[in-house]
Amino acid sequence: MAPVTSTSSTSTPQATEVLRRVFGYDSFREGQQEIIEHVVAGGDALVLMPTGGGKSLCYQIPALVRPGTGVVVSPLIALMQDQVDALRALGVRAGFLNSTQEFGDREVTEAEYLAGELDLLYLAPERLRSEQTLQFLSRGKIALFAIDEAHCVSQWGHDFRPDYLRLSALHERWPDVPRIALTATATPATHAEIAQRLGLEQARHLVAGFDRPNIRYHIEPKQEPKRQLLRLLRTEHDGDAGIVYCLSRSSVEKIALFLQENGIPALPYHAGLDAATRAAHQSRFLREDGLVMVATIAFGMGIDKPDVRFVAHLDLPKSVEGYYQETGRAGRDGLPATAWMAYGLQDVVQLRKLSTEGDETHRRRQLDQLDAMLALCETVDCRRVRLLAYFGQDGSPCGNCDTCLTPPATWDATVPAQKLLSTVLRLQRERNQRFGAGHLIDILLGKKTEKVLQFDHASLTVFGVGTELSEAEWRAVVRQLLALGLLTVEGEYGTLSLTPESAPVLRGERPLSLRRDPTPRKPDRSAKPGGSSAKPAADLAPEAASLFDRLRAWRAATAKEQGVPAYVVFHDATLREIASTHPTTLGELSGISGVGENKLTKYGEAILTVLEDQP
């Protein structure tokens, strides 16, 4: 970066000047300035801030203000090139070292670091295992260490990386170099674990609000998941970029093919694809408009695509942390976005079964995480309030999630629950048998299936006693009893057994109220966040909307020519402001949020030309 002349009496450039000149913003978000000034002064920090909340500036600005190079530890090898490209577009001297580089490129980056010609250097955590790397870093001047995605140090987290456990040693080797650890996802317990494992107990801590008000949360019963997803995309997100998460590789391939066959541009992404294919699909998703990525959780961490309009889950995430982080990839630009999930009985059975693996401590942790996820799915209260409470924060009903917009009915399910639990009990006591949910429902409905006849279950006194409910309603009952811990899943085949908590219900000592699943319907287009469309130009005046489209077309051509994602040139939010205010001079353009000095020099005249050519 070109030197910044300080406006103060000190020789150190001021953070606010860097914010305006380099990044093009006039003011900091809540908490940013305090943390930045603390790190600039040489202090350690631990930052918990939601995706899209401005975490990166908390280390990027101190790295530009302090003498030396900011060393950023990041697990996101596949994204380092894009991160560096985005910084270079701002005039920041950035580089990376990882296993994907050619030898010559690595030599150039190393020489730049040793010559003091880098503001930021990105490294994967595994490189710091090497004494050779540590000695190399010692030969240059380090401004700070930034530990990105710091939740990876948590052994109980959903993204645990063993190499992160070694990062506490950085302070031992460089005791005078400040450290800043950052994550978008951490409960109070995980927060404490990060601080303890990285030796940051005495650091300055910033816990920003976890609420993402532009995201609308919607969870519906899983019935025909492919069709439900297709309805969502066609009625609410036609032509939008989005991510669809599935639990297995085979599901990813099937859903991607299904969407393609229905005219929706979709790409698969999972660990079973070769590295070149994964890289190509990721690059297309970042650079092209309107693509849908169908993926396992192997995809998404660090994806800085601001205009992802929806994140859909076709399988239940294993934890609320995972769900929050995955849904947080939508709407990074602050515009309306949707977090949608189809959730059903088989999800609960499958994850309950997985939670029986491992040692006792691991099993207990997995069950606790799953219980919290199930509570979020089955709540009759505001989903946003429930989500924030999980992270130790208060909230009030948002009026914007599915449970606020259409409050679910509850019903007295005591008798049906007793019938189901009694069926499980009788099979176990009288026949020494255990079965899965489907067979139990067949017994209750009085279906003489081949399996029912084979085991003579038509002779049970409970055979046919549950005809007052449909099969779908019985599946909802089983799902909720599993979520409440009144039933448990056992063994390879997912058979159901009673728990100690089921006894009071069986004896009639505990009444049971369950959530009634809503009748499937088309999503309400008027119920988008803020009551407006998710389309970036939806609320612009006609002339501004036309200009916005022209600016996006110019941006797409420019990004293609430069070989970078479109958002590296400008975010939609910046183009919206340009279209709305219609600046006529470079001076006026420089006042737009997101137009820093380097981008003004690089793109200013071209933008003014687009504005002048507006018919």
Question: Across the structure, where does each feature detected by a protein language model lie?
Answer:
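Helix-turn-helix/winged-helix DNA-binding modules
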Residues: 27, 303, 379, 431-432, ...
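Short, charged low-complexity linear segments at domain edges
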Residues: 362-391
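Accessory DNA-binding and partner-docking regions appended to nucleic-acid-acting proteins
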Residues: 2-16, 365, 394-615
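Eukaryotic partner-binding/assembly regions in large regulatory complexes
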Residues: 310-315, 377, 416, 476-477
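Helicase motor core with emphasis on the C-terminal RecA-like subdomain
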Residues: 2-22, 26-30, 34-46, 50-56, ...
